[in-house]
Amino acid sequence: MYLCSIMSITRVAKLAGVSSSTVSRVINNHPRVAPDTAESVRKAMQKLGYTPSDRRPGPKPSLRSRTGATTIAFVVLGTTRNRSTPAFEGLVAGVSQAARQHNFNLVFSHIPDPEELPSRILSDRLDGVLLHGALPGKELLERLRKVPAVWLMGNRRRPEWGDQVMPDGYEVGELAAKHLLSRGHRRLAFFNLDTKHWALRLYGHAFAATATDAGAVCEMVEREKPLSSSGYWQEYSMELVEDAVRQYLALSPRPSGIFVADDMQVAMFQPALQRQGVVIGTGKVEIVSCNNETPYLIGLHPTPTEIDIRAESIGRRAVEQLIWRLEHPQIAERIVTTIEPFIIKSDA
């Protein structure tokens, strides 16, 4: 039945001069199809005698809200609104812009306890979900698996289902290493206070591999962040920072090029290093950090070179990926999309 439906849609698409996905949108009364295009598709359907089946692939009109628009939810697991990071705000902006562009109904839901099964998720008639944060508990997982899903960013633990849009972690680490190497640094160090965060580990792996391939030396100054019940976004302890700084100070010869895993960490590491007499700046110890989260950089002098992960672009692209998934529910394989970062060099 699915094969017949797909073949019929393909014939309609060919006659109308559009893509199969456009035919699917017209069938589902999707609001983002141009009126002229929709009319061409309907004429082609009439000419071919094609009547859509309720069993065809793709999102069904019965899943639409009463207004006829697609309803998606942005679900943030393991935290509350008041603990968000600047990068997350960029993510929200991207999601909101894309949802508005496609005339989607967008529902935000923060779920502090990922083991909780919120009534809002149960009651809302959702066409798809965007997910960020901690992995859900068993009951919530079973509910979310029934809905087309896209994860945003590189979560602490890699999700086992759903598509994903995230920064290109290999490119992040490579950019950091190549920048420091280009500045003449031959002994490098990667600072990370969260070794259980798989995306940050990926940054470190790529950074070290790039340095080694260039004949440089890379030291790993890492600590495991203790997890608590305070949520997905947790602050790093000063005790861990000072312990890591002591490790760095004991290295001989000491690395002069440092890559810090994220801006929340560099806001703690750079002042801690300077308090110990480490001179930071051009021709001295130079630092690269990641995320380009301006609020964390206020008060740092000099400002570190930044790697911008394009959080807003990730948000927009996640909505586009969810649209694709809604239109291709029969595709079993997961799609993981990475967004290219770029470097913002320090003026120092």
Model-derived segments and spans:
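Short beta-strand elements in bilobed, periplasmic/extracellular small-molecule ligand-binding domains
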Residues: 99-110, 208-240
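Alpha-helical recognition/docking segments in bacterial nutrient-uptake
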Residues: 2-4, 64-178, 248-254, 264-267
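Flexible loop/turn connectors
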Residues: 246-348
